[in-house]
């Protein structure tokens, strides 16, 4: 993420000109931009008159600059864009004021956002700027007859390929070389800077030996990790053991996996923990929170007035920080975030038990 400029408006809001550079940056912006914000940028639009009829029946779009007051935000991961919709409040064509418009924000789209930044949103922007230099990582997990490839992004992991076959002995057995060749082909297609090769037993080492002969440039970028499983379980083990941190220091997913494991362990033992909005708000008031864990999707819903909490989520965050606690915002796209969602979307690791 590039921040081209930032200034405070006469109304006390922040006016920030940003340029998202990656899909991760669009994901970050989906949790910074919220209803009521002012967002502006260049776009194209079919011209409408006040009677709602299209002036141009041919459907041609006219380029223009617009500013909208945001009503809805959607991170369309599979379309590689962020959709920001709202009412046009300023425009290079005055006859378009008051109509609804959706800005389709893609990588390298210049965008200006005016809003009162909350502390976690300012942190998220800073994280996105710092993450620009982080390497992208692919995780290949392999065992006899089976291989999977995932890529790691800040919004979660994504499965890129699954390869299954019968290897070993027998009339219909597929030579291991074919499995390794197909895996190598998948790895070559990934636009990443580093690779992790994981799995149980010796198959991964045999695969690495094959890669050193067939794709030596990629083999030089591979880190080998022992896991007890492949696929999603194997990837979780890789993240939990910190292997991704070795090649992508700023990734948040490994940290989330550690936090959720600690949270579940404390719940199991009945020790210093709180979960659910009421319990966590009480812990915040007592100054007992060491680390607050909150789901990004829950933040968005509550701030938009679409949630079901009776507790103000921003008040929990502010109270926690004022009393010396840390705040970690979880991604709903990754397994630890899904586990946190099952606990109400918010939990806390405490300094001491609350009776």
Swiss-Prot record:
Q: Which domain of life is it from?
A: Archaea
Q: Give the record's keywords alphabetically.
A: Cytoplasm, Endonuclease, Hydrolase, Metal-binding, Nuclease
Known cofactor(s): a divalent metal cation
By its UniProt entry, which Gene3D superfamilies does this protein fall under?
Answer: 3.30.1330.30, eRF1 domain 2 (3.30.420.60), Pelota, domain A (2.30.30.870)
Cellular component, GO, one term: cytoplasm
EC number(s): the record gives: 3.1.-.-
As for subcellular location, the record says: Cytoplasm
UniProt record similarity statement: Belongs to the eukaryotic release factor 1 family. Pelota subfamily.
Its annotated function is as follows: May function in recognizing stalled ribosomes, interact with stem-loop structures in stalled mRNA molecules, and effect endonucleolytic cleavage of the mRNA. May play a role in the release non-functional ribosomes and degradation of damaged mRNAs. Has endoribonuclease activity.
Quaternary state and interactors? Monomer.
**Family annotation (NCBIfam families):** pelota (TIGR00111)
Q: Which PANTHER family match?
A: PELOTA, PROTEIN PELOTA HOMOLOG
Record protein name field: Protein pelota homolog
Per the UniProt entry, what species is this protein from, by scientific name? Answer: Haloarcula marismortui (strain ATCC 43049 / DSM 3752 / JCM 8966 / VKM B-1809)
Q: What is the lineage of its organism?
A: Archaea, Methanobacteriati, Methanobacteriota, Stenosarchaea group, Halobacteria
Name the gene that codes for it. Answer: pelA
